[in-house]
Design a protein with these regions (language model features):
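Glycine-rich loop-to-alpha-helix module at the N-terminal edge of alpha/beta enzyme cores
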Residues: 60-64, 77-85
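Intrinsically disordered, tyrosine-centered linear signaling motifs in cytosolic regions
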Residues: 64-65, 207
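Substrate/cofactor-recognition hotspot
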Residues: 9
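PLP-dependent class I/II
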Residues: 2-5, 15, 20-23, 27-34, ...
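Short beta-strand to alpha-helix junction loop
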Residues: 69-70
Length: 390
């Protein structure tokens, strides 16, 4: 009899939404019109200037490995982006290009977390964060958060939940699934609380750029020793290119470079050269138009769902999600999602994918469809509520 697969693998939970997505695909194959509000991927394709840059890179033979830290031109372009957007002078040496934001999270986890140690994470939160910690034999200390703290960690929560095994905290701003943002003052407070305990602060800034009304502050504005995870997937619309970056303190760069060399050698070369076009004025104009469109979608869907009775206690300031309490409708979140998929062919995500705290009566809607599709989705949801028996 073969040896069993690792306990590590068994401990990493699958996405509940994937079962719903598989069923949605079956329904589509049967000819049903499914409205997808479950997957966190922009519906826009990659902007044309980026595509052209990628095509030019392929034609020019830019298909070989690059340095593990990424091509110098891209690290310099990102450094310039921090200067223009945040007024920050970030040495390009501190920027490592990674295979998606996931690559940045993997590097930070491998560098900072020893076996048996943990980071504090908000619950609800992005599920892969805790799974990456398990992958490096660490753990996530999930901290229940609700609307009273806008679903974010606070210095008081850090003080209450920090223990002998804590080595840091990972926060997200804007956050998935709630869309809430940490202010500059809140980031500074978290930094102070974690430094007082000799820990590391890691901030997921993957949804920076996708904010509505107030720009998100970077933690690097208040803490130059923080680790920042970012990605070309969301604001820049390059999900399938698999490209991200990590900003780290200068003292950590050599260790991170060694890890990168061993874990993935380099990020995809053609994607790196394509990403140089992300920072061109014509591209940024397209991206800002898309941001405005996401804002219009949020401004439609938020009041529409509230009018139907969904309790969305905190208005999202960024990303493209609404996190809704469905307890007033009764029943379990997964069954609720399944009902609307089967009866109305609208797919959204059960809260179980984002943690444990009150997860069974929360769902997440992604406004990654155009306004006519969102309007149709709301009509279907209104109809489906009449037949729901929680």
């Amino acid at each position: 009899m073969a040896q069993p697969y690792s306990a590590r693998s068994r401990a990493i939970e699958p996405f509940h939404v994937m079962a719903l997505l598989a069923r949605a695909n079956e329904l589509q194959a049967e000819g049903h019109d499914v409205i997808h509000l479950e997957i966190g991927e922009p519906d826009f394709t990659t902007a044309e200037p980026i595509i052209r840059a990628g095509q030019a890179a392929l034609t020019a033979g830019k298909t070989r490995y690059t340095a593990a830290r990424g091509i110098p031109e891209l690290r310099e372009a990102i450094s310039g982006f921090y200067q223009s957007r945040y007024g920050l002078n970030i040495d390009p040496r501190r920027i490592l290009i990674t295979p998606g934001g996931s690559g940045a999270l993997l590097l930070a986890s491998a560098l900072l977390v020893d076996p048996g140690k943990h980071w504090l994470l908000a619950d609800p939160g992005y599920p892969c964060n805790r799974h990456f910690l398990r992958l490096v034999e660490g753990a996530a200390q999930l901290v229940p958060v609700g609307p009273d703290v806008r679903y974010q960690l606070t210095p008081d929560l850090v003080e209450r939940h920090w223990d002998h095994a804590s080595v840091g905290a990972l926060v997200a701003s804007p956050a998935n699934p709630t869309g809430t943002i940490l202010t500059r003052e809140e980031l500074a407070g978290l930094s102070t609380a974690i430094k007082a305990r000799h820990g590391h602060l890691v901030v997921d800034e993957i949804y920076h750029g996708l904010t509505y009304g107030t720009d998100a502050a970077s933690v690097l504005e208040v803490d130059d020793s923080a680790f920042v995870l970012n990605s070309f997937s969301k604001y820049f619309g390059m999900t399938g290119w698999r490209l991200g970056w990590l900003v780290a303190p200068d003292a950590a760069v050599s260790e991170l470079e060694k890890l990168a060399q061993n874990l993935y050698i380099s990020a995809p070369s053609m994607a790196q050269y394509a990403a140089l076009a992300c920072f061109e004025p014509d591209t940024l104009l397209i991206l800002e138009e898309r941001r405005a469109e996401f804002g219009r979608r949020r401004d439609f869907l938020l009041p529409a769902l509230r009018e139907l009775g969904f309790n969305i206690a905190v208005e999202p300031e960024g990303a493209f999600y609404l996190y809704a309490d469905i307890s007033q409708f009764g029943g379990d979140a997964f069954a609720f999602c399944r009902h609307f998929l089967e009866t109305e062919h609208v797919a959204f995500t059960p809260g179980l994918d984002f943690g444990r705290y009150q997860a069974s009566h929360h769902v997440r809607f992604a406004y990654t469809q155009n306004l006519p599709r969102l309007q149709e989705a709301v009509e279907r949801i209104a109809r489906g509520l009449k037949s729901w028996q929680g």
